[in-house]
Amino acid sequence: MPATEKASAPHWSFLSSDVISIMKSNPSTLLLPLAALSLASCANPQKEETKRPNIIFMMTDDHTTQAMSCYGGNLIQTPNMDRIANEGIRFDNCYAVNALSGPSRACILTGKFSHENGFTDNASTFNGDQQTFPKLLQQAGYQTAMIGKWHLISEPQGFDHWSILSGQHEQGDYYDPDFWEDGKHIVEKGYATDIITDKAINFLENRDKNKPFCMMYHQKAPHRNWMPAPRHLGIFNNTIFPEPANLFDDYEGRGKAAREQDMSIEHTLTNDWDLKLLTREEMLKDTTNRLYSVYKRMPSEVQDKWDSAYAQRIAEYRKGDLKGKALISWKYQQYMRDYLATVLAVDENIGRLLNYLEKIGELDNTIIVYTSDQGFFLGEHGWFDKRFMYEECQRMPLIIRYPKAIKAGSTSSAISMNVDFAPTFLDFAGVEVPSDIQGASLKPVLENEGKTPADWRKAAYYHYYEYPAEHSVKRHYGIRTQDFKLIHFYNDIDEWEMYDMKADPREMNNIFGKAEYAKKQKELMQLLEETQKQYKDNDPDEKETVLFKGDRRLMENR
């Protein structure tokens, strides 16, 4: 019986008029038919509609599998993320279809690729009038909420309640962040990761208990510029993190795209915004400094703690004896210390939310999904950021807990994409999946211990558009199969790359055009053509060269 229905009074039409007359004259005889009815209902229970699951869609910004212990990462322990994986399923081959914040979010909402939903780059504005899975769930009786990072430069639609970060062009601030909440602008005091969780729990406390809910719980962290919570400032100051094997990649064996990017730890990380190598006195001398714009949002006691935490770093750098590879290694350590400290707060707050659901008795009736908008480079190839189709960026975390359908401790190698999330939510909610959604429901995988169905897709499709732009990552598209990857870089270059992901998981040696891979290359080219036709990406090589106009399109830190 749906939670919105109330039990109706018993119907007595099956009793004869004589029996009813006896019952009226001797009320105690009511006990007999009531007992009989009770026994009958136990023996022949009425068929009731299965209670529809709640949905909590947890998403962070720029979190990557290398920084999750449930994926075998050795950088940090994430016990609450691990709990979701251990009590549910971990997907090992989940891929973003356009590894950039706004486009990824649009693909997730619509279940469609960027060329279909119209949001191809971070300069786009999301057309909220189009079909999204929250709208469809809302129409089907779900109470819907969007809390945290939205980053689609339009008012959220399809939500009964929304409270989204509004500072820095919807990127949001870590400290005392601005929110746009149900049409009103407010400033919240505190740390963003904690505040977003407070807001999520507040929604759950005040929701309509007679409806299933779908809550999108989206954190800013661990996005650049990686500002830790006050309790985590300096927590990794004395930790030395292992370096990736290709931190000093020279890009031999690759083409111009890898060589001409602008996202290296060596050259692109800034001393102020990223590495935080400014004292308070230096920031106050030039209050137009970008770091000061976020530093000034902190309460004075947090500023004091910040100054103390970064004093050692500033002193080390100013000794002036760091050069070459030693300087790159040093920068890498500072980057990791800040990035991973922001992940700590994310994991702690996931624990808060799980504990609250357990407390109110809704944990096992809630589909809990944790993912990120894409992966991220943590020093691999000498890089930070995302955008490329290379593995650390294209691959995204996906762990799901729902004990009514998922066997605890399952893993899946099925090739999945973020366009699959929308049809999966609709499928579990009992809502018909529209025929124009391009993703596939993961329900058959989830209900079969992660096994790949026989008729499942052979490849994930990818298409990145934001060029020319910040970080100078060329436009490209391609496919990722279980064993190989094929990429075409286009626009102002025309270069192909192909990788054997089993023999070369770090993607160091381009094998496109190698005689020994000729047969496989032909197969992949054919599969790419078929995949583009399937997803209606009919003109992937369009040559637009002028993309970014106006202040918003020139903004950094997206």
Curated annotation (Swiss-Prot):
PTM info: The conversion to 3-oxoalanine (also known as C-formylglycine, FGly), of a serine or cysteine residue in prokaryotes and of a cysteine residue in eukaryotes, is critical for catalytic activity.
Signal sequence, renumbered to the chain: none
First-tier enzyme category under EC: hydrolase
GO molecular function: hydrolase activity
Annotated Gene3D superfamilies: Alkaline Phosphatase, subunit A
General function of this protein: Exosulfatase involved in the degradation of the glycosaminoglycan (GAG) heparan sulfate (HS). Catalyzes the hydrolysis of the 6-sulfate groups of the N-acetyl-D-glucosamine 6-sulfate units. GAG-specific sulfatases play a key role in the persistence of the major human gut symbiont B.thetaiotaomicron in the host gastrointestinal tract.
Homology family: Belongs to the sulfatase family.
CDD domains the UniProt entry points to: G6S_like (cd16031)
Residue positions where 3-oxoalanine (Ser) is found in the record: S101
PROSITE patterns: SULFATASE_1, SULFATASE_2
InterPro entries tied to this protein: Alkaline_phosphatase_core_sf, Phosphodiest/P_Trfase, SGSH_C, Sulfatase_CS
Keywords attached to this entry: Hydrolase
This enzyme's EC code(s): 3.1.6.-
UniProt xrefs under Pfam families: Phosphodiest, SGSH_C
Hydrolase is among the record's keywords: yes
Protein name (database record): N-acetylglucosamine-6-O-sulfatase
